[in-house]
């Protein structure tokens, strides 16, 4: 997958936190979600390209996920452009892609730690983000809430795809899924999931 020159990629602690109650802060928030969706497109396509020998349904599932992630990116980027900004105008971090690199040689780890951990965290983070945007209350913020509704609905399906293929892979290898997940999370330094949980 291609990587554009922008946005500038910085450590997560160096991504500035801005209030969504300002125009620039709202744009920065939209940009952050746009960056997640951009990476999600590449992650889904990498899952198709990198791992040979899976059932045909696996490839169909991840191509559908990639198409939905591209739709999300398009919705967010169009909204960002309506504010006078473009993808790449704010710095971003590369946590999602770093996990892709860490799991590039192990499809079971990929299914465990990208859709079932990082994408699942998005399910937890979206409702509080929407609540903040509702407090902003501007038409721009409320449109962002609507876009996040679409994303949240689709991401539930993406996590389910990851669960399906993680379970299938564990069954093929006679691995107990829960204990193996904990081992993979430790081995790959996956982020610990924090409440609130959705």
Per-segment meaning from a language model:
Residues 1-198:
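Non-heme di-metal
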